[in-house]
Amino acid sequence: MSTQQVPPVTAIGTPRITAGYDEYGRLDLQAHQEVHGGFAALSSGELIGLADRIELRGRGGAGFPFARKVRAVIDSCKRQDLPPIIVVNGTEGEPPSWKDKAVLTRGPHLILDGAALAAAALDAEEIVIGVADDGVGQNSLMAALAERKMPCPTRIVTVPHRFISGEGGALVRGINGEAHIPPGRKVRSSDNGVMGLPTLLSNAETYSQLAIAARLGPWEYNSVGLPEEPGTVMLTVGGASSSPAVVEAPSGTPLMDVLNMCGADIGPGLLVGGYHGKWITAKQAETVMISRKGFAKVGGTLGAGMLIPIGSKTCPIGEAAQVVQYLAGESAGQCGPCRLGLPDLARAVTLVSLGGNALENVRQAAGLVKGRGACSHPDGTSRFALSALEVFAKDVEAHANGEGCGKSVKGILPLPYTAETGARKLALDWSRCDGHGLCSAVAPEIIRLDHNGFPAFPQTPLPPWLEDGARKAVNVCPALALRLIDPAAGGH
């Protein structure tokens, strides 16, 4: 993955965060100042007041009020007599999402402005910016830091490009030199974050919005968008779109305006909010205005702003099955519902895609993981799977009847680990397998035994961190029936 793969950026109405992109491509410090101008420093009270008046919420998915985060950090600093840390979450671990990478790559100074505002207002010890190790945006950010002076020491930390690496607790752990996975228990970063200090952690777009608001002031900022959710929203439109793009649009913009701009073929459904989001129908999409409340009215979620039309020419159940398999492989492996429950869910959804009558198995597997994980990963994965079966009920029925939907899986829902990226997958020689079951004992997060006692596992490429377990399973097979193959090399 390289910076050249960042999709085009466009806007509906007057751009704010993306202003100057068309003229300059990437905004260095001089271009940034020409486009956006300067801003005045804020006190902690002014920072909270500004965030409150513009109803600023986190743009990483959860939508938590930014002012409440700031208050919590200030209270914790006073209580513990410690300085705070400012953390910018620019990891963007979801494969379909590009909005933060687009800003990191083309407008990094706006992110740094927002972080600098918060750091100066709170008299922070340090600013830490977390980015994925895929290389997208990191060089641009480093160049931007070299051009300017920050109010306190500022460093960039890279984390593995995994789905769960961007979870707040996982990012804090990674910065602290621990495993880049969510903590097994609830920990408030505002109390105990980076280096044990109170930590203000928010998403890259959130800090960019803060920088825009500091320049415009609350009245002008609120002049665009909905009264209850003012300002613009950064969206990623991908999937079955002829012109996929990162789009900046005012809240309240009709969803169809955004989709039509990108040439979207919705087909039977649209995924909103990413791989922990939900599917909505094409008819529902016609009624939605871009906002958290707008998506909630049709049972969806804005999340981190991902809009993925499935299209009319791909198999939605097969696409969904691949994503659930991927999400199962992204487990941190630290709780049973995630480590064992998600592979069960993935197998059940895969069986549905292959024509098996496994709907009840999907519901049962989803029910067993819901609300029981150490983080939100099991809940989000089960929500994605169940909504797919609901929205694509006609396709599910066609598969169950043995006829199939007549459409192929085309990779409309992107995955980071494919044959093209060098990922390997397991293969079974059925002529050799005697059903000993040893493989499932050493790698239960990958392999389970079917009702006949034979190994069953996803047919998608394995993420690198599961290869070791797969290799152990291969080595213990007494019949030499199990192999790790490279699909790109013709299965060798």
Give the positions of each predicted feature.
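Cofactor-/ligand-binding subdomain signature composed of acidic, glycine-rich
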Residues: 2-48
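Histidine-anchored nucleotide/phosphate-binding helix
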Residues: 107-121
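Iron-sulfur cluster-binding cysteine motifs and their immediate structural context
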Residues: 337-343, 379-380, 434, 438-454, ...
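C-terminal accessory/binding modules appended to enzymatic or scaffolding proteins
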Residues: 230-239, 249, 414-452, 460, ...
